[in-house]
Amino acid sequence: MPDPAAPAPPEAIVAFEQPDGTLIARWLCTPERLADLALGWLFCEGLVERADEVHELHLTPAGHVRGRLGDAARARLAAYDRDSGPGPARAMRDPIRAPVPLRPDEGTQALLADPGRLGDLFLELFDGARLKSVHGGGLHTGGRVVGGRIVDIAEDVSRSAVVDKLVGAARRQARSGEPASDGALVLLSGRISATIAAKLVRAGVAAAATISLPTSLAVDIAERTGLAIVGRARRETPFRYGGL
């Protein structure tokens, strides 16, 4: 049982602004790894396609994020603000385009077909969840798997922010201008919604696994785009959707 005296999971309102103060986005999230969150959000919303489209990204003294975007990204942002906006409806209304064809590599396909290995990875994921161990719950956890190893773990009160942080960290570590895909598998502790499925596709993530299930709209996105999803991934007979 969690300690009843344990501190509540941290949550804050974080603004993402352009240098002139124009608001790009506002999140309710766990205020950690905010640069990763901002960069990942840009990729996951389809606002940038390459890391070199973000010319500057830094934290302000007030704990917010300020970023300077290239011309192409600012044009996409203007269309996003005017016509779409964030949220579940956008995930189904707007065309969802991956930066590269989505197809898990052979190693990832073998991993997704092995419930024992997936189960071990989820145990490792939860063992490495630093904030969850401190706060006793109330946080979503995700991991990025490359070459069969977990290379990054992100935690947040927001499921969407977990995905943004994982993607942002991967793009920050990649060479400037490299295409937004590296064949990674994303592990998630929570339900995969249409919004999250759309984020994964736009970021070029080919495969995801969850201990929960995808929603029906997420399954629809997976089938249309080739995104591979494994649900109930710790069961002996998990469910498989999309590009599997």
Label the predicted regions.
Residues 1-6, 178, 243-244:
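Short, low-complexity, intrinsically disordered N-terminal peptides in bacterial proteins
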